[in-house]
Amino acid sequence: MLQRFFATALAIFVVLLGGCSATSGLQAYVDSYDGYEFLYPRGWVQVQVEDPVDVVFHDIIETTENVSVVVNTVASTKSLEELGSPEEVGDRLLRNIIAPSESGRSSALIAATSQKADDKTYYILEYAVTLPGDGNTAQQRHNLSSIAVSRGKVYTLSVSAPEERWPKVEDQFKTIVSSFTVY
């Protein structure tokens, strides 16, 4: 009787502990054609997009929270390091893509780091973006991106949320970004 109680308690503990993993509540997205994969939250829905955006998922309740992957062909670039340091790539991304001067958006690079996984270099960028609007309607957003080069293409996975939601989603979004793999 006592053994059965401990066995049952242990089984319940293992099941509950498994739900506490960093990837709980996430599911895999695999694009074997373009050669990348990542985790995204269960219950998020895929949105129709146009090139160069390859895929977008967003929350069905907090629709402004999203994850996207952009794939661009790059002539003669064999490695991410050839594009510059993490800070240089981050500055160019913000200046030319995220918040070009004519867009009315502003941006600030918060952090830029480099990490290696499976012989690939990934630049991890954290940045803030202010969308246009007057003082009351301008929206502050918080973003994380992972950038990698593989097979003559630059892959950029980005997650984004309103700044006021960032503390709630930060850990999950960091897990999503770190799950991004190109091959």
UniProtKB/Swiss-Prot annotation:
It is found in: Cellular thylakoid membrane. This is CyanoP. Its cofactor is Zn(2+). Transmembrane segments: none annotated. One of its GO terms (biological process) is photosynthesis. Monomer. Present in very small amounts in PSII. GO terms for cellular component: extrinsic component of membrane; photosystem II oxygen evolving complex; plasma membrane-derived thylakoid membrane. PANTHER family: PSBP DOMAIN-CONTAINING PROTEIN 7, CHLOROPLASTIC, PTHR31407. A lipid is attached at residue 20 (S-diacylglycerol cysteine). InterPro entries: Mog1/PsbP_a/b/a-sand, PsbP_C. Residues 1-19 form the signal peptide. Zn(2+) 3 binds at residues 142, 163. Zn(2+) 1 binds at residues 31, 34, 54, 164. Crystallizes with Zn(2+), but it is not known if this is physiologically relevant. NCBIfam families: PSII_PsbP. Belongs to the PsbP family. CyanoP subfamily. One of its GO terms (molecular function) is calcium ion binding.
